[in-house]
């Protein structure tokens, strides 16, 4: 996958197109990511120990990884991802600026 947990990404398609957020979780087997504040859905929860009231909760749902692009740290714009080997390690680079995306 071209994005990781903690990356700042921009949604490029779907109902939340244009929104930015941080990746909270990544699901590589399903090719999906959970982005903060994006794809909010209503979940009907039964009363439980943690939530004795129950009711309808708003929460984020995962979106497909092809619908997000990482934000270039240099320009602040969405960019595609390239890979380069530096010091024997494979690192992700921003195609627009050549800046390293991995911290």
From Swiss-Prot:
Gene3D superfamilies xref list: 2.30.30.30
InterPro entries, per database record: KOW (IPR005824), Rib_uL2_dom2 (IPR014722), Ribosomal_uL24 (IPR003256), Ribosomal_uL24_CS (IPR005825), Ribosomal_uL24_KOW (IPR041988), Translation_prot_SH3-like_sf (IPR008991)
MF-aspect GO terms: rRNA binding; structural constituent of ribosome
Keyword presence, Kinase: no
Entry similarity comment: Belongs to the universal ribosomal protein uL24 family.
Subunit (UniProt): Part of the 50S ribosomal subunit.
PANTHER family: MITOCHONDRIAL RIBOSOMAL PROTEIN L24 (PTHR12903)
Protein name: Large ribosomal subunit protein uL24
Lineage summary: Bacteria, Bacillati, Bacillota, Bacilli, Bacillales
């Amino acid at each position: 996958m071209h994005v990781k947990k903690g990356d700042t990404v921009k949604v490029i398609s779907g109902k939340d197109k244009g929104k930015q957020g941080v990746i909270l979780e990544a699901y590589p087997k399903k090719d999906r990511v959970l982005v903060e504040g994006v794809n909010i859905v209503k979940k009907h929860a039964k009363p439980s120990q943690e939530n004795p009231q129950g009711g309808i909760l708003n929460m984020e749902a995962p979106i497909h990884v092809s619908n997000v692009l990482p934000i270039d740290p240099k320009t602040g714009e969405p960019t595609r991802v390239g890979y380069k080997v530096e010091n024997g390690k494979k690192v992700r680079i921003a195609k627009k600026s050549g800046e390293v995306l991995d911290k």
